[in-house]
From Swiss-Prot:
It comes from the Bacteria. SUPFAM superfamilies: Pentein (SSF55909). Its main location: cytoplasm. The gene is arcA. GO terms for cellular component: cytoplasm. Pathway: Amino-acid degradation; L-arginine degradation via ADI pathway; carbamoyl phosphate from L-arginine: step 1/2. One of its GO terms (biological process) is arginine deiminase pathway. It comes from Hahella chejuensis (strain KCTC 2396). Belongs to the arginine deiminase family. Its EC number is 3.5.3.6. This is Arginine deiminase. It catalyses: L-arginine + H2O = L-citrulline + NH4(+). It is found in: Cytoplasm. InterPro entries: Arg_deiminase. Keywords: Arginine metabolism, Cytoplasm, Hydrolase.
Amino acid sequence: MTAATRLGVFSEVGKLRKVMVCRPGLAHLRLTPGNCEELLYDDVIWVQQAKRDHYDFISKMQDRGVEVVDMHDLLAQTMALPDARQWLLDRKITDENVGVGLADDVRAWMSELSAASLAELLLGGVVGGDLPEDFDSREMALFREFMGRSGFVIPPLPNSIFTRDTSCWIYGGVTLNPMFWPARRQETLLAASIYRFHLDFANADFEVWWGDPEKDHGAATLEGGDVMPVGNGVVLIGMGERTSRQAIALVAQSLFRHGAAERVIVAGLPKLRSAMHLDTVFTFCDRDLVTVFPEVVNRIDTFSIRPGDNGADGRLDIRPEKAPFVDVVGEALGLPRLRTVQTGGDSYEQEREQWDDGNNVVALEPGVVIAYDCNTYTNTLLRKAGVEVITITAGELGRGRGGGHCMTCPIIRDPV
């Protein structure tokens, strides 16, 4: 199988062949001013418009030959398989997640749903009003009395739209990421069921480098927006608000043990919501061109991790880098230097455009990216640098603080 057809991501800008997205849906209809902060959204969204804008995003990728698969559809197809359905429900509908006295009834009810309905509720959440009226246990009566018909039996997962974070393909394998905030951790279990059972993946040749949604990873948290397999045996990993040093070391250890990478470059980021992941301040647009938010990127503390002298024992050689982060990345790729396009405009406009994901672009191939339309200054600078910028509407999709890079989980991408 060639690099173009086997599962795996071998660069940040090589031809994008296959990508997973997750369209807005029931989970976003259940966002309210009262719960959106807990669910990591800054505001509620106009869901119908968000759906239209997301469809446009998908269409523009398909127009360039990208195979786009949606997590809703993959999950529904997975839940049509009896073994997969039982595996997932046994792990998701538990006393710990749903409640003693409720879990058995809820699991039995969900076991009988159609595959499409089950997938919708696994992503969109289950409220008291969804459950059959003949659920008459004492525990159900207490739930209805105190939580009402709109109380969450299973909370929604609106951040599933940001498929980049839940799992990340690094060269010929994938990580199943234990995410930082409790509001997102159940997303990984859904992704694991797809990779384990769906026919696109069940018989494919790939490794799970690290991560297990059935395991407590403690302080080791990882999110895909911090992870970039850039080629030449190099992986960039941001260490900031969401991804911890413990997880980075474990991922590096696994990649080195399997011979999948030779060097992990760690970008130490300030712990800011506006810079929650590396890809909110730094993304690739071409083989030698990146867009950066200088206020953060210029402050990155850079470290390189390589296998220790005796690679077999799992020890790591961790060393600080003296050069700026962008220069270290260019050197690791064998380039004289990386060209940079900074967030555009004056200091006010730069801060606004970074907040609106001006640096969070996704490359479809070298020199072609998708970006939000509202970031006019940054997009103009990218075009002046020779990049083809395809725009999508930001108004609703951007309210969860993620752009095109965040909303895509590349599954097959060529090297450069």
